[in-house]
């Protein structure tokens, strides 16, 4: 690495610290509940989950070894997908290895150039990142403001092929949630 490169990195790090944007990895050892994770109740430590993982590792190895499209879609993946589709009574679906990957894949590619996305202002950052990379135009509405959302739907209803509305079932930072009855009523009134 060149001296200029190292100096720039040092300056960038200093700027992050001054602006209180510097982050460090912290070691977390023991906790019964972790509401800052994707595993609130520590289910990954449940004996049945551990036994299932052990059995899968013995049968399939410690990973799929490839992406699903190449050779990484294993019988255990098909069984899981079939079970979910049966439970949800859906004809098809996809598996993703994380919520982040699902958000990126779906929102980056599903809305097209002639579509419009309306997103709650406080959607997860991974959703917002995906919307910045998708070909559709998007606009954010005020957090949980169903009246503003309805105004935007009414105003843009005939201007795009498809309108997508992006919100969350529970907003992870505050624990609040959208008025689902109102959202369903808007869905029935406007085709999105």
Feature annotation, model-predicted:
Residues 2-62, 192:
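N-terminal "arm"/small-domain region of PLP-dependent enzymes with the aminotransferase-like
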Residues 34-36, 62-67, 163-169:
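Short beta-strands and strand-loop turn motifs
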Residues 139, 143-192:
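Active-site phosphate-binding strand-loop segment of PLP-dependent enzymes
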Residues 43, 70-73, 125, 146-147, ...:
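Short, small-residue-enriched loops and turns at beta-alpha junctions
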Residues 51, 59-99:
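Conserved N-terminal alpha-helix of the aminotransferase class I/II PLP-enzyme fold
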Residues 113, 133-135, 190:
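Short, structured coil segments at secondary-structure junctions
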Residues 106-125:
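Conserved PLP-anchoring active-site segment centered on the Schiff-base-forming lysine
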């Amino acid at each position: 690495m060149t001296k200029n490169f190292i100096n720039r990195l040092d300056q960038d790090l200093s700027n992050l610290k001054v602006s209180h944007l510097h982050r460090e990895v912290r070691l977390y050892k023991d906790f019964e509940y972790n509401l800052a994770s994707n595993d609130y109740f520590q289910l990954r430590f449940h004996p049945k989950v551990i036994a299932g993982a052990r059995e899968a590792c013995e049968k399939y190895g410690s990973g799929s070894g490839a992406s699903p499209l190449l050779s990484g879609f294993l019988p255990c993946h098909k069984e899981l997908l079939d079970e979910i589709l049966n439970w949800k009574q859906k004809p098809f679906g996809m598996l993703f290895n994380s919520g982040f990957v699902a958000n990126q894949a779906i929102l980056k590619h599903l809305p097209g150039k002639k579509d419009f996305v309306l997103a709650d202002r406080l959607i997860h950052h991974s959703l917002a990142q995906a919307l910045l990379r998708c070909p559709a135009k998007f606009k954010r509405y005020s957090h949980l403001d169903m009246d503003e959302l309805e105004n935007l739907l009414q105003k843009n209803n005939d201007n795009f092929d498809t309108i997508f509305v992006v919100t969350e079932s529970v907003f992870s930072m505050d624990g609040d949630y959208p008025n689902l009855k109102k959202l369903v009523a808007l869905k029935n009134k406007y085709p999105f």
